């Protein structure tokens, strides 16, 4: 699963996920992309499940890019622990997603195969997504 090799600080504040994606909002590496139209978080496990779904469908053909990285630690306190006594330990990592962000890209497959692979992958993700293709001349 994806996670940072090391961080300057183990824990991070919650923050607010606002605005729309101004970077990473167009297909840059592949021919087709999976774009999120919702705002939210994608965990490393969800990204890995979606990646496996794409890889299984396209088999040996095609090259896949994951355009987001889960670098934000989410802390949790253990079950049945009283409130207080500090912040919990980091349990998993998430990628904050704004509307318009490209999550996956693929090249080397037909449009029909890419559409079906991304449809299978989007079932693994908690956000609404749409299929996009590279603009002519890019």
Swiss-Prot record:
User: Superkingdom, according to UniProt?
Assistant: Bacteria
User: Which UniProt keywords are given for this protein, alphabetically ordered?
Assistant: Ribonucleoprotein, Ribosomal protein, RNA-binding, rRNA-binding, tRNA-binding
- Could you tell me which InterPro entries the record lists for this protein? Ribosomal_uL16, Ribosomal_uL16_bact-type, Ribosomal_uL16_CS, Ribosomal_uL16_dom, Ribosomal_uL16_sf
Gene Ontology molecular-function annotations: rRNA binding; structural constituent of ribosome; tRNA binding
Give the residue ranges for region: Disordered: 1-22
What role does this protein play? Binds 23S rRNA and is also seen to make contacts with the A and possibly P site tRNAs.
Family assignment from sequence similarity: Belongs to the universal ribosomal protein uL16 family.
Q: What is this protein called?
A: Large ribosomal subunit protein uL16
Q: Which species does this protein come from?
A: Polaromonas naphthalenivorans (strain CJ2)
Q: Which gene encodes it?
A: rplP
């Amino acid at each position: 699963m994806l996670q940072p090799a090391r961080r300057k600080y183990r824990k991070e504040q919650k923050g607010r996920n606002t605005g729309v994606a101004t970077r990473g909002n167009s297909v840059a590496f592949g021919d087709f992309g999976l774009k999120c139209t919702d705002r939210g978080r994608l965990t490393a496990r969800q990204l890995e499940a979606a990646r496996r779904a794409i890889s299984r469908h396209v088999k040996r053909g095609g090259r896949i890019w994951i355009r987001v990285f889960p670098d934000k630690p989410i802390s949790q306190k253990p079950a049945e622990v009283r409130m207080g006594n500090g912040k919990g330990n980091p349990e998993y990592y998430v990628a904050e997603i704004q509307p318009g962000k490209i999550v996956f890209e693929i090249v080397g497959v037909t449009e029909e195969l890419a559409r079906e692979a991304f449809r299978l992958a989007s079932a693994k993700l908690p956000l609404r997504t749409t299929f996009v293709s590279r603009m002519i001349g890019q």
